[in-house]
């Protein structure tokens, strides 16, 4: 974890920081207040950080936060990865948005389907959807960190393109690489509560039975 005088990171952003490779230029997509960009530049972990946001207000806040780091941080206003040229940054962080939005951003930038890029993804919602999409589109999870921030569970994912597309099973989509991590039982309980609610609305049949089996498996994992 960084030790510079940049703003303190919450557990979610600290986990994202740790997945960024030292010595590589990074793009912070959805940089918001710029705290992660400041930490990456201020600690010397990245020689260049491209702080990017769709909205002028947050980008201006990021300019203020990152001002002490001069030209180590550059700023881009625009949507997703459209503000970058391929290869401009090889470590790409996308945080602060739901899984569907992250997927839309990646689908719109086919150049990230390349093993040179290190993706750090922090979905605010629907973690299982993102895990499924990554597997189907040929990305492998290289690491995953469970953490809590502002009372919510986050799964910070580190992914890289391999071209090995596969159909993941339901349990993998729900748990990824989180088994055995601190807090995983509580995380699984949250996932299971959503599954149980979903199952109540299903008619009797194969899907309802499959969801019931997943619920039982998550209960087993949560119990240790």
Positions of predicted regions on the chain:
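Class I S-adenosyl-L-methionine
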Residues: 2-12, 82-83, 88, 100-224
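Short SAM/SAH-binding signature in class I
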Residues: 89-96
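Short beta-strand element of Class I
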Residues: 47-52
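Conserved class I S-adenosyl-L-methionine
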Residues: 23-32
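S-adenosyl-L-methionine
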Residues: 1-24, 38, 60-86
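Conserved SAM-binding loop of SAM-dependent methyltransferases across substrates and taxa
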Residues: 33-45
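Conserved SAM/SAH-binding beta-strand->alpha-helix loop
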Residues: 55-56
């Amino acid at each position: 974890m960084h030790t510079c005088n940049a703003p303190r990171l919450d557990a979610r952003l600290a986990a994202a920081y740790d997945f960024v490779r030292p010595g590589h230029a990074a793009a912070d997509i959805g940089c918001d207040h710029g705290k992660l960009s400041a930490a990456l530049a201020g600690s010397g972990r990245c020689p260049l950080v491209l702080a990017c946001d769709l909205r002028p207000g947050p980008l201006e806040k990021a300019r203020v936060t990152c001002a002490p780091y001069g030209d180590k941080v550059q700023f881009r206003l625009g949507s997703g990865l459209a503000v970058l040229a391929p290869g401009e940054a090889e470590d790409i962080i996308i945080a602060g948005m739901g899984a569907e939005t992250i997927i839309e951003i990646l689908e719109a930038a086919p150049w990230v389907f390349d093993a040179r890029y290190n993706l750090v993804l922090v979905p605010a919602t629907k973690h299982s959807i993102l895990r499924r999409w990554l597997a189907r589109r040929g990305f492998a999870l290289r690491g995953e960190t469970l953490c809590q921030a502002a009372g919510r569970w986050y799964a910070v994912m580190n992914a890289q393109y391999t071209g090995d597309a596969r159909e993941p099973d339901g349990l993998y989509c729900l748990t990824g690489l989180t088994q055995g991590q601190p807090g995983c039982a509580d995380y699984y309980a949250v996932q299971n509560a959503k599954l149980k609610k979903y199952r109540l609305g299903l008619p009797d049949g194969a899907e309802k039975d499959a969801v019931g089996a997943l619920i039982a498996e998550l209960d087993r994992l949560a119990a240790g």
